[in-house]
Design a protein with these regions (language model features):
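Acidic, divalent-metal-binding catalytic cores of TOPRIM
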Residues: 1-299
Length: 299
């Protein structure tokens, strides 16, 4: 798609989103705009800290959220209507939107980063896997699995580091590259007792661009001192969690040859739509609570 086609597509998308916006306003609900299916994470938080009386717009991308905002701001009939917007931080500069008080930017790369902390994993282990840390018979197993999770996560971050470095540099140099076709299995092999790289050269993963054009030291400087749990690509981090949970379930169900579980256990666990079903366990940043609460008096 060339630049003209892209602009035409974005314009059409904004037009559709604007019609949805008008419909929400007409029904006296609060319009809320998202990049995509982020409602799966945000819904409970919006209902808890702001209102249940809202309608949402899936704008299909960060730039389209901001384009819709601009369109609303230019419209004399709607510019004073309350509407709030949610976008991911990504590897973007974001300096042009930090001062927009009606736009919430995640404090991490994306909402998916809010699902992978040790604290979230502990809740999943307890509530979904039924391994109770307060039960004397299960507390040792709980601690063992948590320790293994931390070890695998550390290995995963080490393996995924190079990929994140280059994705950051590609973004910095404003190359329009899509990573949707890159599966987690293209990057890492996730086992219950180890995480290793799937590739021998990063150029085999990022095939469409000459990586020799980039100065890796710039990425090293950017990521220095940052927590990969928060600053690495959220989708990759989230897929790591998904895969490891599957590996744990498989280990628990084995008749013999188990590596983590001392005896066979039946664990009722679904891999369907974890972003939505595990939203209740995900972190809720204080800045999100503050953002939502600040609009309560305006309704």
């Amino acid at each position: 798609m060339n630049r003209v086609e892209l602009m035409r597509s974005e314009s059409q998308n904004t037009s559709v989103s604007f019609k949805i916006f008008m419909s929400i306003v007409k029904s006296n609900r609060l319009p809320i705009c998202f990049e995509g299916k982020d409602i799966q994470y945000y819904r409970n938080r919006i209902e808890q800290y702001l209102t249940e009386n809202f309608g949402y717009i899936d704008c299909s991308g960060k730039s389209k959220v901001l384009s819709l905002r601009e369109e609303i701001q230019k419209n004399s009939q709607y510019r004073n209507k309350l509407c709030i917007y949610f976008v991911d931080c990504d590897f973007d500069d974001n300096s042009d939107i930090y001062n927009k008080q009606d736009v919430y930017i995640t404090p991490c790369y994306s909402i998916e980063n809010l699902y992978t902390s040790d604290r979230v994993f502990e809740k999943i282990l307890s509530d979904e896997f039924g391994i109770n840390p307060s039960n004397d018979e299960q507390s040792e197993l709980f601690s063992k699995i948590l320790s293994e999770y931390r070890n695998r996560k550390r290995e995963f971050f080490k393996c995924i580091e190079e990929f994140n470095f280059y994705v950051y540099l590609i973004k910095l140099n404003q190359f329009g590259i899509s990573y949707n076709d890159i599966k987690i299995s293209d990057l890492v092999k996730i086992n219950i007792d180890s995480v290793t790289k799937s590739y021998t050269s990063i150029s085999k993963v990022l095939k469409d661009i000459d990586l020799n054009n980039f100065d890796l030291s710039k990425a090293q400087s950017y990521f220095s001192g940052k927590d990969p749990e928060h600053c690495f690509r959220g989708k990759n981090n989230f897929h790591f969690l998904e895969k490891l949970l599957i590996k744990l379930q498989e280990d628990a169900s084995k008749k013999d040859g188990r590596k983590i579980f001392p005896k066979k256990m039946s664990i009722s666990y679904t891999t369907q739509n974890l972003l939505s079903s595990y939203s209740k366990y995900a972190e809720t940043p204080q800045c999100l609570i503050d953002f939502l609460s600040s609009y309560k008096s305006l309704l």
